[in-house]
Amino acid sequence: MLGSLSIVKKVNLHSIIQRHQFKMLLVSISVGIMSGLFIALVRLNLGMPGHKAFFWMTPVLIARLRGGCKIGTTAGGLFAALTTYSFGANLAGGVIGMPLIAVAGMILDWTVNHIEKNNISGWLLVLILGFAGIAANLVCLSKRMILPTGLDPHFILGVSGFWFRLCSYSFFGSLAGIIAAISVKLKINKQLYENN
């Protein structure tokens, strides 16, 4: 009799965890859709290569860090790309580049899963997510290289070329990771302060 009760408790705990993961997946997808709408409807025209990744990566990564869905960044990134494509914008370089948005999301999900598994916090969290953002956005740069149009030229302050593009993608990727990490770090610090 006692064995059957412990089995029921394990099943109930497992179903609760699954329900929570599903709810957080829906949150990540919703954040991805809102990010995609922002990118599609608000044309910033910054002219900086890789700047759109900042506007989808940061909110989706914050939702993943706060929500805990294991595939939240991947799902949010894909839905951001699908939303922008549906509204005529060009986040993922069209249908050809969408799988690489998923790869960028997988890099971020793997990194966050590693951070959660090893209880990494503090400034090391900020540093790791900054580098993960760089890696994810450089995957997006490789996406631009496989498109039929190739690397269209960008000229800002008389600077152009591959190295400028590489630095710009790295900057916006690291900025997204760092801002997401700091926002979560500030939230944790605020909760610790309120509990004491």
Where are these regions (language model features)?
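Short helix-perturbing small/polar motifs within transmembrane alpha-helices
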Residues: 2-16, 24-31, 37, 98-142, ...
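Hydrophobic transmembrane alpha-helices
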Residues: 3-67, 71
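Juxtamembrane/transmembrane-helix boundary motifs in multi-pass membrane proteins
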Residues: 15, 19, 23, 48, ...
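Hydrophobic alpha-helical transmembrane segments
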Residues: 25-29, 58, 70-78, 95-99, ...
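Interfacial aromatic-anchored transmembrane helix boundaries in multi-pass membrane proteins
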Residues: 37-49, 80-110
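Alpha-helical transmembrane segments of integral membrane proteins, especially early/N-terminal helices
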Residues: 53-63, 93-95, 130-135
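Membrane-helix interface "capping/anchor" motifs
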Residues: 63-76, 115-120
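Membrane-embedded alpha-helical hairpins and interfacial helices in multi-pass inner-membrane proteins
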Residues: 118-196
